[in-house]
From Swiss-Prot:
Gene3D superfamilies: Jelly Rolls. Mn(2+) binds at residues 111, 113, 118, 162. It is found in: Secreted, Extracellular space, Apoplast. Residues 1-22 form the signal peptide. One of its GO terms (cellular component) is apoplast. Disulfide bonds join 32-49. This is Germin-like protein. It comes from Mesembryanthemum crystallinum. Its main location: secreted. SMART domains: Cupin_1 (SM00835).
Length: 233
């Protein structure tokens, strides 16, 4: 009986360990098509590793988050990103960071990070922030939003549409921590309505989504769709 219990325990333990470690790594690109020969590949899911004997402290250092970015644009917003691309020591560590600068009433428009959760920390200013859930059982979506002040922290779950609006009359600054060395970003308006080939009458939308689809979906005329694309160029 004791031998049977021990056997059952070992089987259960082995099954648990298998389930714990038999998971795919987090993707760091939109896709990574496999090749049989390494010399046929142009990208890897991550970066090749530097010889440890050649690593130095500068590989783990980035300078510049003390400098505000230029917010003189239509949105009144700019981001300074720190990822494995400009801080090589982040490679494989699963994190990145960004400084977000806002002009008065500046907006980081609705967007998603397909590969990362974001933690937003307010350094200066007053913000209205929020995220929208994925489709619920009733087909709707729920908004979670708050007003944040200096020192407040808000989290945006991975892949969900979210935004940050500076509702103050002064510039605002925030720091965002992201749970991927390459979180990716999809700005909703640009992805859906941004024109790619204005000369193509029926394929004005990036990435070439038929105008008929959007006219039917939003129940608006093609002229309204075309006007919207022109504002997202």
């Amino acid at each position: 009986m004791e031998a049977y219990k021990m056997f059952a325990f070992v089987v259960l333990l082995a099954t648990t360990l298998y389930q714990a470690y038999a998971t795919d790594p987090t993707q760091l690109q939109d896709f990574c098509v496999g090749v049989n020969k390494p010399n046929d590949g142009l990208f890897v899911n991550g970066l090749f590793c530097k010889d440890p004997m050649e690593v130095n402290p500068d590989d783990f250092l980035f300078r510049g988050l003390n400098m505000p970015a230029n917010t003189d644009n239509a949105l009144g917003f700019a981001a300074t990103l720190v990822t494995a691309a400009n801080l090589p020591g982040l490679n494989t560590l699963g994190i990145s960071v960004a400084r977000l600068d806002f002009a008065p009433h500046g907006l980081n428009p609705p967007h998603t990070h397909p590969r990362a959760t974001e933690v937003f920390v307010v350094l200066e200013g007053t913000f209205y922030v929020g995220f929208v859930t994925s489709n619920l059982a009733d087909g709707g979506n729920k908004l979670f939003a708050k007003v944040l002040n200096k020192g407040d922290v808000f989290v945006f779950p991975q892949g969900l549409i979210h935004f940050q609006l500076n509702i103050g009359n002064y510039p605002g600054v925030g720091i965002s921590g992201l749970s991927s060395q390459n979180p990716g970003v999809i700005t909703i308006a640009n992805a859906v309505f941004g024109p790619e080939h204005l000369s193509q009458l029926m394929f004005l939308l990036r990435p070439s989504i038929s105008m008929r689809i959007w006219s039917s979906f939003f129940r608006i005329g093609s002229q309204v769709v075309a006007a919207t694309t022109s504002m997202c160029s």
